[in-house]
């Protein structure tokens, strides 16, 4: 359903799929079946604006550009960094972009495995992730890649939303957040709501590798007409 009803229209028509029947599914907290952690977050308030807050139609006043790197403390002149601040046009990274990203930053980047053994528990796994991230930042790392790609029958994933939120809060508590970017490489993110939730809770960029792999499989079946794969991803 995610591929056919959500991702396919976004790649083919460059817009989110719309529906008119409303959402009558139970709230995630009341559901008897598994629901992703993203479903537990709901928007409490919406503001209608005219003109719309839209990075495409109103690009003079609205942008999705994302800064990353060692931002330092902009209020402390003694702490201003001389390092370059890099900018992306979007916080969503394709699979090829994340590979270039990793190669570009080299030793200034660390990849943190956000999976854990069945012999561990979730709390211990999160504490381990927080400790690794703090040590890395104190040693001068400017890019954290949080990944759940090592998921297997023997290794369970820490929900990426928990991983990002825990590290973001932990680094803020220790006054280290401004020195590093948090980049989420996750197979959980399948729609704009999950992207927005990750970014809202502290991620700098998101690489939805599983969603992109799914779209590539549909592209190989020639389900996107005359569009090439890169064009579908950009759309």
Predicted regions and their residues:
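Short acidic (Asp/Glu) and glycine-rich catalytic loops that position anionic groups and cofactors
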Residues: 16-22, 142-147, 214-224
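A broad, low-amplitude sensor of folded, mature protein cores
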Residues: 80, 85-86, 129, 146-148, ...
């Amino acid at each position: 359903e995610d591929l056919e009803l959500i991702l396919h229209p976004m790649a083919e028509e460059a817009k989110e799929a719309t529906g008119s029947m409303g959402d009558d599914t139970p709230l995630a907290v009341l559901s008897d079946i598994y629901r992703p952690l993203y479903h537990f977050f709901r928007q409490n308030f919406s503001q209608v604006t005219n003109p719309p807050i839209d990075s495409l139609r109103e690009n003079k006043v609205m942008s999705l550009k994302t800064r990353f790197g060692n931002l330092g403390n902009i209020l402390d002149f003694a702490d201003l960094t001389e390092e370059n601040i890099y900018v992306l046009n979007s916080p969503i990274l394709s699979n090829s972009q994340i590979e270039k990203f990793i190669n570009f930053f080299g030793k200034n980047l660390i990849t943190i495995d956000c999976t854990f053994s069945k012999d561990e528990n979730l709390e211990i796994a999160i504490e381990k992730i927080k400790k690794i991230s703090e040590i890395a930042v104190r040693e001068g790392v400017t890019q954290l890649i949080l990944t759940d790609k090592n998921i297997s029958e023997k290794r369970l994933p820490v929900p990426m939303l928990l991983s990002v939120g825990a590290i973001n809060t932990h680094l803020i508590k220790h006054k280290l957040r401004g020195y590093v970017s948090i980049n989420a490489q996750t197979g959980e993110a399948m729609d704009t709501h999950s992207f927005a939730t990750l970014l809202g809770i502290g991620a700098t960029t998101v690489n939805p590798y599983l969603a992109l792999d799914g779209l590539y499989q549909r592209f190989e079946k020639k389900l996107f007409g005359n569009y090439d794969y890169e064009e579908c991803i950009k759309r």
